[in-house]
Amino acid sequence: MTSTPPRWDLTPLYQSIDDPQIGKDLSAAAMQARRFALRGQGKIAAMRPADFGKMIADYDRLNAKTDKVSAFAEMVYTADRADKRNVAFYEKTQARTNAILSKTDFFEAEIADLSDEALNRLMTDETARKYGFWIERVRADRVDLDDKTLAQLDKNAAKTQKALMLYDKTADEIDFTLNGQKTTSSDLYAMAYSADETQRYKAGLAMNDGYKSKADIFASVVNTVAKNKAFSDEKQGFKSPVESRNKSNQIDNAVVSALVSSVDEAMPAVAHRYYALKAKWAGRDKIGYWDRNAPVSGIKPRRYTFDEAKDIVLSAYDSFDKEMGEIARGFFDEKRIDAEPRPNKEPGEYAMPIANGKPYIKMSFGGTTNDVLALAHELGHGIHYELAKKQGSLGMQMPVTTEETASIFGEMLAFDTLLKREKDPKQRFALLSDKMNRVMLTTFRQIALHHYEEDIHNTVREKGAVSVPEINSAWTNAQQKMMGPAVINDERSSSCWADVPHLLKTPFYVYGYAYGECMTSSLYQVYKDGKIADFPKKYKEMLAKGATERPDKLLKPFGLDVSKPDFWKQGLGMMKGYVDRLEQLTPDLTQNRNAAVIKQSRTVGR
């Protein structure tokens, strides 16, 4: 049995990028799209309910057909981005599928514009009711405004897009400098997570200085986006900056408030304590901003072969549920995993859903604990897609609040398996510390970013604009509230708000990560408590529903209510438990610790 990370086999989809079946499938899809438009464009409101139901089902099948070709093209491209034929094939395929689907753009637009009376009449069809939650999401961004206001919204959208392009162009043109040499933000970002403290500090400072040099331009973009959003929200009746995102996520405002307040309340007991422990491990009272994600020094990380990772992950899923274990095993047996690290392969991981086929996984396995957990994470997505594929292409389009449920749950199963198998106290210590680093990023950091966004948008609404010093202050205050007194957070990191442009491109989406992490943690805690009969069966039934129900309804079979702070506190309590265990292990691992670390910290003037 080899331990070489595998390559995937895409031939069950198409034999190669030259497979004539690709052209046949796209031609068939183009014909279907033209017929679809002839049948329905301008006619949706007056349709018979049965015809409306058939239109949705046909729209679903058409999306599934184009999704298959698009998925194949993306997988080929991301597996080797240097192959010019792959690049050309990917670009050509994207252009063709976009052109095909553009013929159907009217459908969602007309559904969004339906009066409530017309929609209620159409929804008497059984097939249409099957797609009820999808229709609800399509209508979430419905705008019922006069023509003058709509025209202004269009103008503002164009201004926002132009401003965001300026943001990207400016960021690309920054001359980042480290040790007198030009470098890139991605290289600096990687060094900011280095085990070498001096390197972390210098890289972080170089990143901050680079963004600071263009802060005035970035601030002008922030103001443009925030002002245009304020206008849009006012005209649509949204009372706070986050409400429009809540509506598109199909989440009540009270649920988001309960999540945010629960995370805020847990910050001292979880985040502050964890960073204080990190300072203690380094032999000091405080650590710097760039030390917050540093790996534990003095402990050699354990390495895993791919076969070992496979065994850990499959054992984790098998121990939870045999059917889920078999679904996971199918990815290995059917060569649906590309885990081989190689040049020109796109960084990162993904699970690719295919409504008319089986999902695939891409990652680059390097043998670290994070790689083992990433494998479990992506297999969780894959299992979710397999169980939900009966819902069709539209029923697999999960909102951000639930799309990470199965992946995080699978990661937790694998983490517990790793922890149970690990007998070395130092390695258990490292496992728990790495886990908490991820929790800080996925939960507490995201809520800090959420507060930063709120501060910026509220300032613009109150004062008409926000200045660079005010943005710096909003950023620093939000980070400090999350990190607590054990982290030094000053002007040396105050311009790093410019490194998160996604907050402008998709405002207020980041709480979705914390929602997913906390919701799944709470669900996992319920599983570990053992009080729910047939938990694995109920869990699989929940996943099999895909995107056909609101997030809050999915948890009803477990007796859980996401609008109650107590729900969120269950998951946050599990995170606190990790910190408790780290505190218990700390005394044995900090004796006679690493004078070199302390000495090094003094050399960089912290």
Task: Name what the model sees in each region.
Residues 399-427, 435-437, 441, 516:
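Post-HExxH zinc-binding segment in Zn-dependent metallohydrolases
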Residues 315, 319-326, 352, 381, ...:
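Conserved helix-loop functional segments at active or binding sites
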Residues 1-4, 17, 133-144, 250, ...:
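C-terminal, non-catalytic "cap/extension" segments appended to globular domains
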